[in-house]
């Protein structure tokens, strides 16, 4: 939700509980990895893919 329209309408927008989510799908279009972590943690996609 890049523009917080859905999260605001559903009442799910709480900045103090902000999280980041990463989903990685394989060539077969199946979910291979799902990570949920605090927004205070930085993103390093090279490290995730490793």
Swiss-Prot record:
Query: Where does it localize?
Result: Cytoplasm; Lysosome
- Mainly localized where? cytoplasm
- Which SUPFAM superfamilies does the record cross-reference, listed alphabetically? Thioredoxin-like (SSF52833)
- Keyword field contains Signal: no
Modified positions (Phosphothreonine) are 3
Can you tell me which family this protein belongs to? Belongs to the peroxiredoxin family. Prx6 subfamily.
Q: What is this protein called?
A: Peroxiredoxin-6
